[in-house]
Amino acid sequence: MKLAFDDFLNSMSETNTTLDYFTDFDKVKKNVAQIEIHLNQLNYLLGKDDLKQAVYDLYAECPNAFSILEILIAVRKKEQKKSLDEKGQVVTLNSYFQSADKIIDFLNNTGLADVFRDKNIKNLVDYVFGIEVGLDTNARKNRGGDNMSKAVQLLFDNADIYYKKEVRNTIFTDIESLGADVKQFDFVIKTKRKTYVIETNYYNSGGSKLNEVARAYTDVAPKINQYSQYEFVWITDGQGWKTAKNKLQEAYTHIPSVYNLYTLHGFIEQLNSEGVIKDW
């Protein structure tokens, strides 16, 4: 039995995060490995009293070593960051890496020169590993949606529910009215009664995106549900929905199968009662 909307809203979870959400160490290690040779070359500068001469010497031997200096101030090369130079001109950061004198200006003006001389850093590979961990926190927002999919997948797995993930809508040729509304579904589950096409998402905070999603799925659901052998299922969660209560309530009223992580057990019970098909 479907929960009353207020009960559904109040059962929204505070988080969908697992411990692997906070830092993607595989990505961190990959990013560090890509520049590790240059970092070890730059290690030559650490602790040098005459840093200026050390830069000249290293630049003469390995000019490309300095091409990664931006990461030492937590800036990625692809960002093409700009700053004002000593003449007040707008320049890109990588323009400082075209000569030894410019590199010395960069080190002095960013404060890295003092850090290098004072031996505050022992090894630039370890230092950049820490920077990469910090920068990776910016990707957490993107991992939120993936984490919801993982949470749903875990519940399906624990219940021994067979599913397919990220299924293109083109395999459902008999759903003529779908068009390009949903290019692929997060999960598809078949039972002896019907095929369930499932979308999942999670919102920690509010914004116009929530209203757009609720409106879109309210439109999509009847296009799919008009075919008796199919049913659209929306699994969503997060405290952000409390800022878009009205639009969610409208969707909850019009879409027969809307669940969150708390109520999903009801859908799983329904699937088991219908008999999940595994050989498709």
Swiss-Prot record:
Say which species the protein is native to. Moraxella bovis
- Enumerate the catalysed reactions: Endonucleolytic cleavage of DNA to give specific double-stranded fragments with terminal 5'-phosphates
Q: What is its EC number?
A: 3.1.21.4
Q: Which domain of life is it from?
A: Bacteria
Name of protein: Type II restriction enzyme MboI
Its keywords, alphabetically, are: Endonuclease, Hydrolase, Nuclease, Restriction system
Please give the biological process terms from Gene Ontology that the record holds. Answer: DNA restriction-modification system
Q: Which EC class does it fall in?
A: hydrolase
An example Gene Ontology molecular-function term: type II site-specific deoxyribonuclease activity
Q: Tell me which family the UniProt entry assigns to this protein.
A: Belongs to the DpnII type II restriction endonuclease family.
Tell me one Pfam family matched here: DpnII
What phylogenetic lineage does the species belong to?
Answer: Bacteria, Pseudomonadati, Pseudomonadota, Gammaproteobacteria, Moraxellales
